[in-house]
Amino acid sequence: MNLVGKCPPGSAALDAAADRGFDSVELHLRPSDLDDVAATAATLEQSPVSARSVHTFHARPDDPEPFRLSDALAQRLDAYLVVHSQYAQHTHTALLDSYDFAAPCGYENNPGASQFSLANLLLDRGHDLVLDTAHLFMSEPAYLESLTTLLWDYGDQIPVVHFTDSTVLEDGLAFGDGDIPLERTADVLDAHFDGAVVLEVMPDDQADARRRVLEWLD
């Protein structure tokens, strides 16, 4: 697996990601980052890291412009587009598909989306899944079994994984602040996944998360 950082596409944030040991990142977009897609892309191209993926910001699913601009940025950077919004359910996938994304893309699983629903609403319809471990932990009592099954059965449709800690109520926690069996999760990913693993914790916690994963897999 390839460990990837996460940060906004500003020069200081990108430099800091490189200082934490990352050579690639997933971009956390804010509305202002899409005011000038060419300028945002140029900032990346001049930075010490590359963009592995671009995460749409949390726009309303019936507002196509933010999604299309995110797609345009991903295209310019030759990056993967993570289609996700707190306002969109997986039942909105047909609407989002109608925006005709040109970059390779996948849909991130929402909190509460079970393995069964992800198979029915996304994977068995041919869509890629960006598998968020925290959201899966919040959705599946047999979390490790579900994680393993999804990677085993649909690995060719899961190019990006988000790895973070979580409780059943709160996600995006620093490693060790939640209840996910992190080392066992890392073992499952190491055994069944060879794509990008985005350490989706706050920037100041990413170096520690990276160190822990490397130690577990040593």
Describe the function of each predicted region:
Residues M1-F57, P61:
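N-terminal pre-domain/capping segments
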Residues N2-P8, E26-H28, R52-F57, V82-H84, ...:
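A cross-family glycoside hydrolase active-site/sugar-binding cleft signature
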Residues L3-A18, D63-F67, Q75, S117-L118, ...:
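Histidine-acidic metal/acid-base catalytic patches
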Residues A12-A13, D33-A38, Q89-H92, Q115, ...:
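Short, charged/polar "capping" segments at the starts of alpha-helices
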Residues D19, E45-R52, T56-V130, M138-S139, ...:
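Active-site acidic/histidine proton-transfer and metal-coordination neighborhood
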Residues D23, S50, A79-Y80, P159, ...:
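Short acidic/polar active-site loop segments enriched in Thr and Asp
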Residues V25-P31, G106-N110, E140-S146, V168-E170:
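Short, mixed-charge, low-aromatic patches
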